[in-house]
Amino acid sequence: MSDWVNVAPQDEFAPGEWRSLDVDGTRLAVFNVGGNYRAIEDVCTHDGGILTGGSVEGDEVVCPRHGARFSLITGAALTPPAYEDVATFAVRVEGGLVQVRDNRWD
């Protein structure tokens, strides 16, 4: 995926909300953290489960199963039991739409 993909209209994506979507076989999670949009791969590197549904505390998401924390800015695994980072993705607002892009393969 190297093109921008629409996630949601900005006016329907309030602070504190998240969206999960599948783009070209990759499950992404996009978070609105106080008006700043962050996107990571929606998978806990500890056990492969999804991160959406876990709590968001500042710029971190907490895995709902075992409590591993990941940075929504860098994707870094911050606490055990996860030790591997998750991928992050570029996010922008264009024409009133929140969009995400994966440039890992450009």
Where are these regions (language model features)?
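Short Gly/Pro-enriched turn/cap motifs at secondary-structure boundaries
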Residues: 80-82
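N-terminal pre-ligand scaffold of iron-sulfur
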Residues: 1-58, 71-72, 76, 85-106
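Short cysteine clusters
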Residues: 44, 63-66
